[in-house]
């Protein structure tokens, strides 16, 4: 196993522990708690894949961070922070909408790279809006936290989420996954619309109604893709 992979996991575990202690003091805002919950799932998946104990890795990560901080001057820290690009966290959904459990009458699931696409194929003739919470850097989608499809009544009928065991995805991966979800929902004569933030950062091209501009041929192809259940 690559040593960098192990040490990266150890540092991530320790930093998550620090963030958790911060949240335990009720100091974290909603986006902070969002990321904390998602990162916990990711660390569990990575730990299982690597065969590493999280508690042991956290202790090792603490030692690594302490060694780095011992050598870090305040001036170097200021320069590092100044050189970092500005990261923004955008939220379409409330914490309740993100954490709410939902069920599917006719479940369909597809894995596309490191993203899992789920939808209820029993939903027909509904108006559906896609909402997402994600981070943006350099005016582009950087990391998808969670995307969900809601009916006008507020029911959840679809979802795109990162796989905890396969971290890392591009904005193009997210765009393709959204296309698959839209295609599957439109196959049952649902009308799918996209939130303004998703229009701006994930699609950049939509009609006035907020619906992504997908060619009919592409829509049919994406819908057929969802026919096979994983």
UniProtKB/Swiss-Prot annotation:
Q: Where is this motif: Nuclear localization signal?
A: 34-38
User: Which segment of this protein is annotated as the motif Nuclear export signal?
Assistant: 137-146
Q: Which Gene3D superfamilies match?
A: Influenza virus non-structural protein, effector domain, S15/NS1, RNA-binding
Subcellular localization, as worded in the UniProt entry: Host nucleus; Host cytoplasm
Which InterPro entries does the UniProt record give? Answer: NS1, NS1A, NS1A_effect_dom-like_sf, uS15_NS1_RNA-bd_sf
Copy the domain comment.
Answer: The dsRNA-binding region is required for suppression of RNA silencing.
Quote the subunit structure annotation. Homodimer. Interacts with host TRIM25 (via coiled coil); this interaction specifically inhibits TRIM25 multimerization and TRIM25-mediated RIGI CARD ubiquitination. Interacts with human EIF2AK2/PKR, CPSF4, IVNS1ABP and PABPN1.
The record's listing under Pfam families reads: Flu_NS1
Entry's family note: Belongs to the influenza A viruses NS1 family.
Tell me yes or no: is Lipoprotein among this UniProt entry's keywords. no
GO cellular component term of the entry, any: host cell nucleus
Q: What does this protein do?
A: Inhibits post-transcriptional processing of cellular pre-mRNA, by binding and inhibiting two cellular proteins that are required for the 3'-end processing of cellular pre-mRNAs: the 30 kDa cleavage and polyadenylation specificity factor/CPSF4 and the poly(A)-binding protein 2/PABPN1. In turn, unprocessed 3' end pre-mRNAs accumulate in the host nucleus and are no longer exported to the cytoplasm. Cellular protein synthesis is thereby shut off very early after virus infection.
MF-aspect GO terms: protein serine/threonine kinase inhibitor activity; RNA binding
Give the matching SUPFAM superfamilies: Ns1 effector domain-like, S15/NS1 RNA-binding domain
Q: Where is this region: CPSF4-binding?
A: 180-215
RNA-binding and homodimerization: annotated segments: 1-73
Q: List the disulfide bonds.
A: none
Where would you say this protein principally sits, based on its record? host cell
Q: Keyword RNA-binding on this protein?
A: yes
- What's this protein's name? Non-structural protein 1
């Amino acid at each position: 196993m690559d040593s960098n992979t192990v040490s990266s996991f150890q540092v991530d575990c320790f930093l998550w522990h620090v963030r958790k202690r911060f949240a335990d003091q009720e100091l974290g805002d909603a986006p902070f708690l969002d990321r904390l919950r998602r990162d916990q799932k990711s660390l569990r998946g990575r730990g299982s894949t690597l065969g590493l104990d999280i508690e042991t890795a956290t202790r090792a990560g603490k030692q690594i961070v302490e060694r780095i901080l011992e050598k870090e001057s305040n001036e170097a820290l200021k320069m590092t922070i100044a050189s970092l690009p500005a990261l923004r966290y955008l939220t379409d959904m409330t914490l309740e909408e993100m954490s709410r459990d939902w069920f599917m009458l006719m479940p369909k699931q597809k894995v596309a790279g490191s993203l899992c696409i789920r939808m209820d194929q029993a939903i027909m003739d509904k108006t559906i809006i896609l909402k997402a919470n994600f981070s943006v850097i350099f005016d582009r989608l950087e990391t998808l936290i969670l995307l969900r499809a809601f009916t006008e009544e507020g029911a959840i009928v679809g979802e795109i989420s990162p796989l905890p065991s396969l971290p890392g995805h591009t904005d193009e991966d997210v765009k393709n996954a959204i296309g698959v979800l839209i295609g599957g929902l439109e196959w049952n004569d649902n009308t799918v619309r996209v939130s303004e933030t998703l229009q701006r950062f994930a699609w950049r091209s939509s009609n006035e109604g907020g619906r992504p501009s997908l060619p009919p041929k592409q829509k049919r192809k994406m819908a057929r893709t969802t026919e096979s259940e994983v």
